[in-house]
Amino acid sequence: MGLVSDIHGNRVALEAVLADMPPVDELCCAGDVVGYNPWPGECVDELRARDVPTVMGNHDAAVVGETPFRFNGMAKAGIDHADRRLSEAQLEWLAGLPTERRECDGRVKLVHGHPDDPDRYTRYTYPEEFSPRLLGDEDVLVLGHTHKQGARQFAAGIVVNPGSVGQPRDGDPRAGYAVLDLDAMTVDTHRVEYDIDAVQAAVEDAGLPKRIGTRLARGQ
């Protein structure tokens, strides 16, 4: 199973991840398909075309008006850009995303931020905070929101953040994803380079804040 999260409208990074990912039976997304970067519609369409099980992230929720989460000016600019760019069908798809879901007969649980706070997005769960207490009756918990890649295996199961496809914040500018093997109960994290210069140029062409592009090169 391929795992992605926090694509944030970065089509170039998403294409690089999909090209690099080994063959998988299923691809799942832990939310925040849109926001920040210039291509929200293209990223939504890619997941829709592949019928990717996806949960709603806080930026997705903001575009469809379903979150109390407060955003800074840079994030708000990306949300407003997505709201202008997305078609009615794309908005309907976002609005229909659940805040949590189960896959593989319930063995895999996806949320965006924290399993105890799936719809308000006020809690961040960093990799160094992963613990068995986060697991319920699922074998694998997949989450995003922090843009920091990490995975830990416990006797009770696996907790994994596949990392951010479109805006990593762990000091590594490469796009992140993970591959889960449920039979072996193992997970491998991956990074892949993509054309950051092209994204930075598109950010400026779209009239988005320049810092959205410049931070990509730093992985922050």
Predicted ranges, named:
Residues 54-55, 108-111, 141-143, 158-161, ...:
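Short hydrophobic-aromatic micro-motifs
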Residues 1-8, 107-114, 159-163:
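Active-site-proximal beta-strand elements of phosphoester/diester hydrolases
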Residues 2-95:
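Core catalytic region of metal-dependent phosphoesterases/phosphodiesterases
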Residues 69-79, 108-136:
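Active-site-proximal segments of metal-dependent phosphoesterases and phosphodiesterases across multiple
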Residues 100, 110, 177-179:
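Conserved hydrophobic/aromatic beta-strand scaffold that supports enzyme active sites
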Residues 152-220:
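Acidic, His/Gly-rich catalytic cores of divalent-metal-dependent hydrolytic chemistry
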Residues 122-150, 155-160:
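Anionic-ligand binding region
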Residues 8-13, 35-38, 59-65, 102, ...:
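Active-site environment of divalent metal-dependent phosphoester hydrolases
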